[in-house]
């Protein structure tokens, strides 16, 4: 009898990850075991393997709960009773970004709360999809588990009541069977899905009212990713969310959704691509390695999230980077990129024998090796440049000195150069009245300003006094500021005038002393001074990002030598700054100490006499 009981006990044991998950589930273990027993007794091995995958990877997955979040969801359901589940999964998470909602929120772990009935209903639906949808036959079981099977994609509250969106895959299947000669690629299937959804969810994506007087909300890139993931997987289209935790060449982060196609590496919108990324991560249901802290070692929270897969190599050329960390006793080191005017770690590695190997780092990026002392980020040397060919160069300041003229603190993009190019062929005219019937041409703009900065036009003495002055062009004029000055240097004031057919383009923005506000006026814009005025100077700026050198503002140039050092401070008296005695080979950072938040690190290329932003 004892022998028989031992056999029964052993038959209930599972492989390591499944058993560990069951152990962590506490009182909910019986619910999860009921799922496994259901498929074992049914003899459905595919569904059993799917259940084992979901349970083994379930540790750590959770939603957030407190009275405020519950009240928000109830109010949302009352306000929008027709809202589909795919939208609810997204909007239910909007309060997660507000401190007043999540300050005392409790993590509700799936292992401890999911019912057997919910999991069985979910697995039955997705496995039926897998078996019946012809377009899924080329996907591996591993891809099916990762990109279709999961019941959640983030920390959203789980919806136990299924709606019609749960079975969209059946409608997609019917359409592919009707159009038998259409190869069902993921992108083609997505077009079918658009036909099913139509525009029914559009009202919830832009400027829609939230309950509990929380204002209006417009979907950002992460919301749109969640929505697309929710809709695509409901339609039987494997997909995932990829993201850049911190851009290495500009501020911010970015999320986008990606179709998983077994016949090509990835299939995304072109505007989500960037030629330089340090790390690209994919949000997953399954676990991936995370650093294990040593005694009293601080690990940033972002690296403790096990649901991230490194997919950098699917987007950019990568190289491994091996660096020395001889002075640090921590277990882990990091590589950081410059983002939002600070160094932000994007990769980690274990220190072994005083060295750390960082795998698959994006090329053409400047990295700073760093470690943490308690929670303080500390540089572990000077920045390195991982070049496009995979080699590395340490950016060490040298004893050799040079001078540098600076006209901007942030790189241009092609689209921004169009702002100043739009000013080409515009001209300034003066006339006796606002009809400009017998106008006098004062100046013709023949070249764009390369720095998107102010341009001064000195009016010849031969030009007399006129009541009305304007800028006129062959098309719309993108203008940030426009001012007319007297011989004494005083700014002249008058009534704003513009083309009579121009409406709603806020022409006043060109005269509000703020170059970041702009107007896109039709044909022409100017001033009526009510009496003839002798103008000696015209000062204008196209639409701009205000990252040029602006007179009157204070700037500081920094260089890095294991930390930031000042190379000098100046108040701008012209549209450029000159700094002398700068160390060659260093990494620099020009700061606007008066205002602004867009600033980039750079090096100086003496061979081509140019600044290279990173």
PLM feature spans:
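Hydrophobic/aromatic-rich core segments of domains that either
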Residues: 17-26, 40-42, 175-192, 201-211, ...
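Secondary-structure boundary elements
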Residues: 33-34, 42-216, 252
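Extracellular beta-sheet/turn segments enriched in Thr/Pro/Gly and aliphatic residues
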Residues: 304-312, 382-408, 608-614
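A short, amphipathic beta-strand motif
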Residues: 317-327, 406-410, 414
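Short, acidic Ser/Thr/Gly-rich low-complexity loop/linker segments typical of extracellular
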Residues: 342-354, 568-572
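Short Pro-Gly-centered beta-turn/loop motif in secreted/extracellular proteins
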Residues: 356-368, 372-375, 463, 580-585
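Edge beta-strands of extracellular beta-sandwich domains
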Residues: 375-396, 480-481, 597-607
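Disordered, acidic Ser/Thr/Pro-rich linker "stalks" and the adjacent N-terminal cap
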Residues: 401-465, 476-550, 555, 596-614
């Amino acid at each position: 009898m004892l022998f028989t009981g031992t056999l029964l006990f052993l038959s209930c044991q599972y492989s390591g990850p499944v058993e560990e998950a069951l152990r962590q589930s506490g009182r909910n273990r019986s619910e999860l075991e009921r799922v496994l027993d259901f498929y074992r007794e049914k003899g459905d091995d595919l569904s059993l393997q799917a259940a084992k995958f979901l349970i083994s990877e379930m540790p750590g997955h959770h939603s957030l709960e407190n009275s405020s979040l519950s009240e928000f969801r109830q109010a949302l359901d009352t306000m929008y009773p027709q809202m589909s589940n795919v939208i609810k999964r997204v909007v239910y998470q909007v309060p997660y970004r507000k401190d007043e909602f999540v300050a005392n929120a409790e993590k509700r772990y799936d292992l401890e709360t999911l019912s057997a009935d919910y999991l069985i209903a979910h697995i039955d639906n997705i496995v039926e999809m897998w078996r019946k949808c012809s377009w899924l036959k080329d996907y591996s079981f591993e891809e099916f588990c990762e990109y279709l099977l999961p019941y959640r994609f983030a920390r959203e509250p789980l919806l136990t009541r299924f709606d019609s969106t749960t079975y969209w895959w059946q409608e997609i299947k019917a359409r592919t069977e009707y159009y038998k000669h259409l190869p069902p690629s993921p992108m083609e299937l997505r077009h079918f899905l658009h036909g099913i959804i139509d525009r029914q969810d559009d009202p919830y994506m832009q400027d829609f009212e939230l309950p509990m007087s929380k204002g209006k909300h417009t979907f950002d890139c992460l919301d749109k990713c969640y929505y697309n993931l929710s809709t695509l997987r409901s339609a039987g289209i494997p997909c995932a969310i990829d993201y850049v935790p911190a851009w290495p060449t500009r501020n911010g982060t970015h999320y986008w959704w990606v179709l998983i196609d077994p016949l090509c590496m990835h299939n995304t919108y072109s505007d989500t691509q960037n030629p330089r990324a340090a790390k690209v991560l994919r949000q997953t249901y399954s676990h991936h390695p995370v650093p294990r802290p040593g005694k009293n070692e601080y690990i940033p929270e972002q690296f403790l999230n096990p649901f991230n897969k490194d997919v950098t190599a699917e987007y950019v050329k990568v190289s491994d980077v091996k660096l020395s960390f001889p002075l640090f006793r921590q277990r882990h080191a990091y590589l950081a990129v410059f983002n939002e005017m600070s160094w932000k770690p994007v990769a980690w590695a274990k220190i072994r024998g005083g060295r750390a190997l960082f795998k698959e780092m994006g090329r053409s990026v400047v990295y700073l090796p760093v470690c943490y002392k308690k929670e303080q980020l500390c540089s572990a040397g000077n920045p390195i440049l991982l070049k496009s060919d995979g080699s590395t160069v340490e950016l060490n300041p040298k004893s050799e000195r040079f001078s540098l003229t600076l006209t901007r603190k942030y790189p241009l993009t092609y689209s921004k150069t169009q702002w100043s190019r739009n000013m080409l062929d515009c001209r300034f005219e003066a006339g006796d009245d606002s009809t400009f019937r017998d106008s006098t041409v004062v100046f013709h703009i023949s070249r764009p300003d390369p720095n998107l900065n102010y341009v001064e036009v000195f009016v010849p003495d031969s030009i007399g006094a006129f009541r009305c002055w304007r800028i006129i062009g062959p098309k719309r004029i993108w203008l940030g500021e426009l001012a007319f000055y007297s011989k004494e240097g005083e700014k002249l004031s008058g009534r704003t005038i513009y083309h009579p057919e121009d409406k709603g383009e806020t022409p006043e923005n060109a005269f509000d002393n703020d170059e970041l506000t702009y107007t896109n006026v039709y044909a022409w814009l100017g001033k009526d001074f009510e009496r003839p005025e002798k103008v000696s100077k015209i000062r204008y700026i196209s639409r701009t990002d205000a990252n040029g050198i602006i007179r009157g503002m204070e700037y500081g140039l920094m260089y890095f030598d294991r930390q930031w050092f000042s190379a000098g401070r100046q108040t701008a008296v012209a549209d450029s700054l000159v700094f002398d005695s700068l160390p060659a080979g260093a990494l620099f950072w020009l700061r606007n100490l008066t205002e602004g938040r867009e600033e980039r690190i750079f090096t100086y290329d003496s061979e081509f006499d140019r600044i290279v932003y990173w």
